[in-house]
Design a protein with these regions (language model features):
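Short stretches within intrinsically disordered, low-complexity N-terminal or propeptide regions
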Residues: 7-9, 160, 683, 687
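N-terminal cationic leader/targeting segments used for protein routing and processing
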Residues: 15, 20-21, 676
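Carbohydrate-active catalytic/glycan-binding domains of CAZyme proteins
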Residues: 20-607
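Local alpha-helix boundary/kink/capping signal
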Residues: 11, 61, 192, 630-635
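Sec-dependent N-terminal signal peptides
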Residues: 1-6
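C-terminal segment of classical bacterial N-terminal signal peptides
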Residues: 9-15
Length: 706
């Protein structure tokens, strides 16, 4: 370890990294890439909270001929409300979907009164336009969904998918100009025109806009403005029937739905919000947040995405059903009915084809917290035919399993209830299972059940620490924590954006590791490690592959690593397999905190990544830095969780000089000292993640007074 010395930092170095990205000062090659340690689902770092993600694939502006997957979302950085001041974009090369790069806060808006607008769910589209010389040029229209007064319909334009973007339709009062039509949760679809006989052939495209909260509207947009209704056309309102719960239509009695296919039941659509449209073959598929659950035997929730399909971008539509229920639908213990294994709040997303694989993107709320939502993804299989919808053609979205004979996953109970949407897993883009020989935080678990089959509402905790890719899970007696799935069979060659990895062969002699901190001092604790299912029966075929026994007299509040030999059960196994941890105890109530788990082989010892710490003194006296950052609000406009602040009062005779030590060779820091006897000292600390070129910087402000 290298002991680093203190140094002065110039004021220009205190510009936040996020601000530099937005202003174009940080090159793409210098941006943070999430490539440290085990990665799963959520597919972005566990400290990052990007809900409402709209997935797109665009050509990489820095590598012509290569393509990147982009996720364009809002940003939960306020901690006490939805979203924040920026539209956030992350992207990854389509050939490696585990290398997500933070492209930064691509757009913010500060009003004339100095306050920052909050940005809700956005959309971004690419259009080919002519430049001044008549040559084709790619331009990008951002629909940021500002919540600022009279700015909901704001539209912005840029030359790159990662910005910067400039508003197009604001007047001198910073309000959207007359005719701007885009509303809540905007979605825009670009229909490319290749037919020379089409009246829009010269323009090359038609544009359609969709919006609405508990009410659905669609319209053709004016290609000249991209923010107003096309002259000579009228919006379709309502576009889809909206519901107040599953099957209960909320639109006014007598509403005529002109955009539904003949014979469609308005109660089957259940629109809530979050419109998004894609083309699949010769059909158009609308994804939206919609009430679901009773159609497969569960309670009604809007924590699900539904879909419908049509022959044209504005319908007439046929209902397709549920695309994903973020509550994680599974069989109950005896398989007689379905149940949920995860938390509910809301969700938002869409489908996107990347290479030859379709995915559905959505978000989850840790323990149901809607202010720290996380980006999730699942593979899907889409089946469609060439027959027009008007003649009986269909689109069907299935859960996807690469190891199933028909590549279809579904959960079907013996009572006949069947959930056919995407499976909620720990995998992310690791669709062949998580590479087993890595540490996986509790944040990558996808099953959180208590002994009664519900969810422990105090389980998965939020994380705002950009140096620490970890979430901790509080555990009660009887809780079940599950990971679906580990790729124990390995992957022999790169496939579908996943790099090849080793499985648990007999040469490895594999062990399994669990990190757990006991917080209760009463009784012993047993952690059963189950494979394939949490229960031993003919429905789940769960198999106990190990047991961890924690004695009643074991230390409290002491994080321990427990290792068991599981080679007998996992070595030379094929495919992917779920691992469940079942926490048993003689007493009810809280047991402790589960940190994470993973496999290791006989030649290596699995280590849990630990973030760096700074040892700070003022006038020779050690102080404790704040653990939680200053969160964003309308006044500070923070777009990240890098700002920390504290007050410190000097003791008599104590000098205000700040000194910093850190026993980490990959850490650099600078200190702006107080000018005089009191004032604000600033510590800027830059952490280089081991084995990578990715850095994250924190700024600590210490307000020193006598």
């Amino acid at each position: 370890m290298l002991l680093l010395a203190c140094a002065l930092v110039l004021s220009t170095q205190n510009i936040s990294a996020a601000k530099k990205v937005q202003e174009g000062q940080v090159k793409a090659s210098q941006r943070f890439v999430h490539n440290y340690g085990g990665r799963g689902n959520p597919y972005l770092p566990l400290w990052e909270h990007v809900p409402d993600g709209e997935p797109k694939v665009f050509e990489d502006p820095d590598r012509p001929g290569h393509y990147r997957a982009y996720i364009i979302g809002s940003h939960d950085v306020s901690a006490n409300r939805y979203c924040g001041p920026d539209i956030r974009i992350w992207s990854a090369p389509i050939e490696n979907l585990n290398e997500w790069r933070d492209d930064g806060p691509v757009f913010t808006f500060q009003a004339a009164n100095g306050r920052w607008d909050v940005m809700y769910a956005p959309d971004l589209v690419e259009v080919i336009e002519k430049d001044a010389k008549g040559k084709d040029k790619k331009v990008y229209y951002l629909y940021p969904h500002s919540r600022g007064p009279r700015r909901e319909a704001m539209v912005c334009k840029g030359d790159r998918p990662d910005g910067p973007f400039t508003p197009l339709n604001l007047d001198e009062n910073q309000a959207a100009i007359a005719g701007s039509c885009i509303g809540f949760d905007p979605s825009v679809f670009i229909e490319k025109i290749t037919d020379k006989d089409d009246p829009d052939y010269a323009k090359g495209f038609r544009a359609y806009g969709y919006w609405g909260f508990q009410h659905s509207t669609g319209a053709q947009l004016d290609q000249e403005t991209m923010y107003s209704v096309r002259p000579g056309t009228t919006p379709v309102d309502p576009l889809l029937p909206a519901s107040s719960s599953y099957g209960r239509v909320r639109d006014r009695q007598g509403t005529v739905y002109t955009a539904l296919a003949e014979g469609q039941d308005p109660g089957q659509f259940n629109f809530f919000e979050a419109s998004s449209i894609r083309q699949v073959g010769n059909k158009y598929v609308m994804i939206f947040s919609g009430y679901s659950g009773p159609d497969y035997g569960l309670g009604s929730t809007n924590s699900a995405l539904r879909y419908c399909y049509a022959d044209s971008p504005l319908g007439p539509w046929k209902s397709g059903g549920v695309a994903v229920d973020s509550r994680g639908v599974i069989l109950n213990e005896d398989g007689t009915k379905l149940m949920t294994s995860n938390f509910a709040h809301n969700t938002h997303g869409s489908i996107q084809q990347i290479g030859d694989q379709w995915y559905i993107f959505y978000h989850r709320p840790p323990r149901g917290n809607g202010n720290a939502r996380q980006a999730m993804v699942a593979p899907i299989k889409i089946e469609w035919d060439e027959k027009p919808v008007s003649e009986g053609g269909t689109v069907k979205i299935h859960g996807y399993d690469p190891y199933a004979p028909d590549e279809i996953w579904e959960a079907k109970a013996s009572n006949g209830d069947c959930y056919s949407g995407a499976e909620v897993t720990s995998e992310g883009f690791n669709i062949y299972g998580l590479p087993p020989y890595a540490y996986y935080s509790a944040g990558y678990a996808c099953v959180f059940m208590n002994k009664n089959g519900g969810q422990n509402r105090n389980s998965l905790q939020d994380n705002w620490d950009i140096w620490n890719n970890e979430q901790i899970c509080n555990v009660d007696a009887g809780d079940i924590i599950g990971y679906k799935y580990f790729g124990l069979g390995g992957l022999k060659k790169d496939s579908k954006g996943v790099e090849a990895f080793d499985g648990t062969t007999s040469k490895q002699h594999s062990s399994f590791n669990v990190w757990f901190k006991r917080t209760s001092g009463e009784g012993g604790i047993t952690i059963k490690v189950m494979m394939d299912g949490p229960w031993k029966n003919d429905v789940w075929n769960g198999k106990e592959i190990g047991k961890i026994k924690i004695p009643a007299n074991s230390p409290v509040n002491d994080l321990q690593k427990y290792t068991i030999d599981v080679s007998e059960f996992v070595d030379d196994i094929e495919g992917k397999h779920a691992i469940y941890l079942v926490f048993d105890a003689a007493v009810d109530g809280a047991l402790g905190q589960f940190y994470g788990c993973g496999f290791n082989n006989k030649t290596t010892s699995l280590k849990r990544p630990v973030p760096p710490t700074l040892n700070v003194k003022i006038g020779g006296k050690e102080i404790e830095l704040p653990a939680e950052p200053v969160h964003s609000n309308d006044n500070n406009g923070y777009t990240d969780n890098t700002h920390y602040e504290m007050d410190y009062k000097l003791e008599p005779g104590q000098k205000p000089r700040v000194s910093v030590e850190c026993l980490w060779s990959t850490m650099q820091f600078w200190v702006d000292q107080v000018k005089g006897d009191e004032g604000t000292a600033v510590i800027t600390a830059e952490y280089l993640f081991p084995g990578t070129t990715s850095k994250q910087t924190k700024v600590y402000k210490i307000n020193i007074s006598k």
